[in-house]
Every structure is written in structure tokens, then in C-alpha cells.
């Protein structure tokens, strides 16, 4: 499910940043569980907490995740899913269609658009860097992710 998670090692990123990264990686997994198992987000959160959270904590050498961020972005993506998906579809190049994206790639884009255009707590450059790194962890095409997120970050989008 996750390949290069060790890149977020404690020697590279401080604990406070790894907690946020862990929350974002966890959000990708929770949204994946919700999509694949066709369950609501609360059920997916519970399944994740019981079965997968300890793996993320161990891999990132953390005691806990940034839970407020995790809940805010997962619930936010669920709430804004349709307008976010519309913006993703609208802004993909002609040779890319939304159904060409893997579930994780799509959810990473959803999370990044939610954080850039709704949540607005972190600056867009930080969000782009974080989600491009997460794209890499989930075997995504980082050139695509970087190009798409950079392009869309320059637009005035209201969700």
C-alpha cells in the first residue's frame, strides 16, 4: 500500500511536521478504505485506527498523529467532494481524464485542493510540496502531481 514512507524519517523532518504528514498519509488511506469498502467516513476512520494507524506511527517514529488535521481534511473532502472532483476534471489536460487516476492519486488531489481552497491554513507551496511527496509514497507520477498542483494553485477557485 505504501512504499517510500521512510523518506519522512525523523532525521529529515521534525516531529511536528511528521505528525501533519502522518495525518495526511492517514487521510489518503481512510478515503481509500471508504471508497473501496463503500463505507462512511466514520467507519473508515475506525477501521484505520484499529488496523493501520499503528503502522503509520511506527514508520514515522511518532507517538500520535495530528488528529485535528486528520479529521478536518477527511471530513472536508467528503463534504466538498463533488465541487473538488469538478475542478479536478475541469483542470486536467485533454489527454488525462479523472477515471484514469488511481483511487489514491485522486484522493491525494482531493485532499490538496481541499487544503488549498477551503481549509487555507497552510500556504499553497507547503501543501504542494507535501502532497507531491505523498504522491511519491503512493507510487504516483510526481511530475504529473507537481505540474497539476502548481497549475491549479495559481487559479482563483471557490469550492
Describe each region flagged by the PLM:
Residues 1-159:
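N-terminal interaction/assembly modules
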Amino acid at each position: 500500500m505504501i512504499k517510500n514512507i521512510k523518506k519522512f524519517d525523523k532525521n529529515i523532518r521534525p516531529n511536528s511536521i511528521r505528525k501533519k504528514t502522518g495525518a495526511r498519509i492517514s487521510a489518503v488511506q481512510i478515503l481509500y478504505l471508504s471508497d473501496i469498502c463503500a463505507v462512511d467516513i466514520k467507519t473508515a476512520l475506525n477501521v484505520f485506527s484499529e488496523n493501520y494507524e499503528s503502522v503509520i506511527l511506527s514508520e514515522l517514529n511518532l507517538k500520535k498523529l495530528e488528529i485535528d488535521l486528520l479529521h478536518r481534511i477527511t471530513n472536508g473532502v467528503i463534504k466538498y467532494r463533488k465541487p473538488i472532483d469538478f475542478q479536478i476534471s475541469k483542470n486536467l489536460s485533454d489527454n488525462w481524464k479523472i477515471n484514469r487516476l488511481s483511487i489514491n492519486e485522486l484522493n491525494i488531489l482531493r485532499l490538496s485542493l481541499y487544503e488549498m481552497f477551503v481549509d487555507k491554513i497552510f500556504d499553497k507551496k507547503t501543501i504542494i510540496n507535501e502532497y507531491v511527496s505523498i504522491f511519491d509514497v503512493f507510487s504516483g507520477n510526481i511530475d504529473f502531481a507537481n505540474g497539476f498542483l502548481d497549475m491549479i494553485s495559481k487559479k482563483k477557485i471557490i469550492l
